[in-house]
């Protein structure tokens, strides 16, 4: 049966069935869609910069394990999305980026804001040249299944045409991911190709005395948030050591007896070297996980399972069927002890916020100290730009994560930790926090410098918070932190805390 409807209405109907909220900034080339969404059941959050829309969609996707959607106009609207979409690509986050375009007859004719838009196709992009929902169906499926950003570029005149819902050959603008699959030693975000058959692994169990399971964030698959929380109860029953990559921390409570914890440059190395077999479950094996100096040695004894479960029963079945060999003892990751003023204050923050808080760090010294000082007990205990290292990440991603907790009934505090450099990169999004009264604790570690690079001069950040009508305070002494956090937890509104710190050198990576 052929169904004919107006394409604009078809898009909004599709979005209403698949998303609860989008993050957007209006502009000429998307006005038809923007206005139609405003009149729909979809919650439309207007950001204050297009970068914010991309980052918020990213944060929403990471905490919910669902798709995050952003909508921006053509030209400068789309170019502003470059950094957040690159971040979601490198960090493997399911983001749909919808951008506007001038009418099809004006493309390539130097029209206002008209440029080639394929720069957003880090993973996949579709030029929606025809009024067909297949573009949307394919984009959402790809993004959700593969946890990557997908770009939908829609010319303005297509909205007014009528949809013919029949099979078409999708017109891909460009797939920039081809060069990312050259060899196993340099795969970037992609899973190593050499994937073993389960039966082969089972038959070989007796050959190995020291099997280590390494789990990456890919194991979240398409699970609901509630099912993500159940993975730890499956893993803690296993007898052999389990290690995690940085983004997968908390997938098993790091207090469990069989949890080795974080491995790699900022984790422990010894279990990787001692194991005679490593079962890699859904990790991309980045250079942070397998450092370059020992990478080839580790890859030679690694067997890969690309498990992308649809429900918790599939994870149970895998580990029950697999059987994993004998238990063995090895070194475990341990949180460091704070040494200087900076790490002592970070530690005091971590010790006083709820243990299951969603801590979202920016890029910088505070990120490393948070990683080294926090014991992760639940999935997404720490969210960071672990593969792209994006400054200006924390505040807008925290906003997206907070909206995700609201939409999906996730009862956890959201805590943003930034340096004074990164905080000022997206400070305009404080208006979104204020406007929606989002309960987010924002910590700014103020040391008036960009790591070891240079000194910087800051504005009065507390007065900035005042301008956005956000409660705030200034802390110099570490003893002030516990009471400040206790007061925040009691309230139902946002708070910004500026923590004056003295500089401190980072511990050296383990390798």
Per-region residue spans from a language model:
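Phosphate/pyrophosphate-binding active-site segments
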Residues: 1-6, 153, 165-170, 176-177, ...
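Short amphipathic alpha-helices and their capping/turn segments at secondary-structure boundaries
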Residues: 85-87, 140-143, 349-352, 430-435, ...
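Active-site diphosphate/adenylate-binding microenvironment
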Residues: 7-13, 17, 25-38, 327-405
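A general structural motif
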Residues: 49-50, 107-111, 188-202, 261, ...
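Active-site nucleophile and cofactor-binding loops and adjacent substrate-binding regions
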Residues: 25-27, 45-55, 70-76, 362-363, ...
